[in-house]
């Protein structure tokens, strides 16, 4: 059986088509488009016309792909952008009207749960932290002996934090202090455990450090993360693509996107970081294919 999972984030819209093979999920096709749905969401918490229109166009193209690939079983989910937007229901109705696709808005708990499920596929440890850095929110979970025991979802994503603090123009002192304060509230971050990292910004970090896209399960030290953060931050946004191999669509959100990770590493005092190439989509696909 083939299954598709569509994941609408604040920055990107993604779709994966999967099947189960030898007890594991196998990805058959992947689509990704940068839509920046949360662009301009701002203080009024209203989705703006242009981001909604470009996101709808991608949904329409994904519906066509599902038809061409003969995929009848699919699930579409959304995260922080639609959790936060006051006009989210209007957009959801619009997508349903034009594409027939129903969107389920995940709460922070389930987003953290599915991210942790994806992280387990990349980890060789049973106890660890997971941080999933998205465009609108950041999910942090604590896994002990394979079970999620604590989680948090905070609106600290790379797009909204770039809009809020603009660290590449105004300096990173304010955003770093803000991240430290936000993580201080999470008293359960109190052990030195490995940190598994997920999300689009994380992929760019992995490529900039390792030099290739074969990063799933690869381990690096926290010092390498701190060093690369400093290099990226000190490099002008237009030059980051050529110098570090970063996707041009993410060059402007890298500073804000990496601040939650550096804050978490400093709080835990743990020196090991493990990259995960999967995410919420794979966590959901695994659950549905097991049913």
Residue ranges and their predicted role:
Residues 136-142:
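Acidic, divalent-metal-coordinating active-site segment for phosphoryl/phosphodiester hydrolysis
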Residues 11-13, 136, 203:
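Conserved Rossmann-like nucleotide-cofactor binding loop
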């Amino acid at each position: 059986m083939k299954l598709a999972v569509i994941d609408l984030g604040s920055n990107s819209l993604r779709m994966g088509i999967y099947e189960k093979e030898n007890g594991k999920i196998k990805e058959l096709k992947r689509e990704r488009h940068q839509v920046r749905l949360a662009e301009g969401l701002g203080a009024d918490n209203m989705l703006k016309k242009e981001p909604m229109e470009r996101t709808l166009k991608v949904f329409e193209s994904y519906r066509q792909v599902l038809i061409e690939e003969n995929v009848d079983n699919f699930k579409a989910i959304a995260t922080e952008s639609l959790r936060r937007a006051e006009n989210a229901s209007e957009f959801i109705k619009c997508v349903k009207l034009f594409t027939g696709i129903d969107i389920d808005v995940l709460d922070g708990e389930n987003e953290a749960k599915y991210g942790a499920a994806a992280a387990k596929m990349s980890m060789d440890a049973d106890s660890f932290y997971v941080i999933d850095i998205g465009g609108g929110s950041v999910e942090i979970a604590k896994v002990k002996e394979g079970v999620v025991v604590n989680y948090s979802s905070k609106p600290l994503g790379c797009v909204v934090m770039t809009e809020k603090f603009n660290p590449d123009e105004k300096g990173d002192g304010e955003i770093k202090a803000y991240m430290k304060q936000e993580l201080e509230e999470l008293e359960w971050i109190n052990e030195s455990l490995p940190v598994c990292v997920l999300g689009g910004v994380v992929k760019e970090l992995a490529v900039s450090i390792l030099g290739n896209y074969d990063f799933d399960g690869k381990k690096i030290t926290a010092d390498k993360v701190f060093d690369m953060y400093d290099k990226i931050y000190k490099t002008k946004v237009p030059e980051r693509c050529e110098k570090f191999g970063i996707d041009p669509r993410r060059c402007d959100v890298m500073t804000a996107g990496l601040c939650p990770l550096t804050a978490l590493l400093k709080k835990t005092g743990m020196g090991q970081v493990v990259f995960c190439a999967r995410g919420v989509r794979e966590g959901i696909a695994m659950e549905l294919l097991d049913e």
